[in-house]
């Protein structure tokens, strides 16, 4: 058996359950500790999945932890990732990497300087459908592609998330940061980097029941 990485999970909210359930199918890493600014959330995860709960700072400085799984709210991604890297740990974050391009570039520079890996959701472009599309493009089955689009509609994060408030923040909130990465990642993977960016928007109702 190859190396098993010891992982510390930060952010014991809604998405953490998905990672805890999925990680049992992999034999190259193990979540051994968890942390959250809400200590009760961390204790609940620790009890459910039979691991240790510690404070966020303790986890980030823990020499046993090799990889930090960053599942905090978007506005906290940059700070947790930066502290993790500076403490010599590889990082995998939920999307987005950061809420500004400047902060994202800084994280990449730190990772390169420290010779660490930093990864980020979504990894959905590695799924069967996207990879088949990539194969067809590589084989030029459909000729040269000139245009691609992604369409998404749903009633809002408040329709399923138990704590949707952070996703309505003026900075670090909204559908572009929440759902946009899935479509942008797929399009960039299939068509290459964007040369220009523009947008249109629709003014939505000012009030929404949460």
Each predicted region: which residue ranges?
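Rossmann-fold dehydrogenase core element
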Residues: 106-123, 144-147
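Predominantly a Rossmann-like dinucleotide-binding segment in NAD(P)-dependent oxidoreductases
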Residues: 124-202
